[in-house]
């Protein structure tokens, strides 16, 4: 459990210090999880679905983790994604 916490803390620290990282991307991740759909999240965020997908892909590349598993039936959080979501919510609540 401590290892998971430290790993998540390292991810969170990376988020804060990465100049290309924006809080908006964290909002995107949270909205995708809330809606369960990239399409619906994009509609509610008033952006295009390709823009949302690119923002998520950029975040995954910057962080070096896969947040979502994408398949024809929808998306699901990966294990790393679940940890990242927890800390993303904390960061968003504090801003």
What are these regions (language model features)?
Residues 30-46:
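Short helix-boundary/capping micro-motifs
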Residues 26-33, 78, 85:
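Hydrophobic residues on short alpha-helical segments
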Residues 62-63, 84-95:
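Alpha-helical linker/hinge and terminal dimerization helices associated
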Residues 22-25, 49, 74, 81:
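The N-cap/first-turn positions of alpha helices
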Residues 37-38, 56, 70:
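Helix-turn-helix DNA-binding elements, focusing on the entry/boundary residues of the two helices
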Residues 60-77:
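A short LG(V/I)-centered, amphipathic sequence patch enriched
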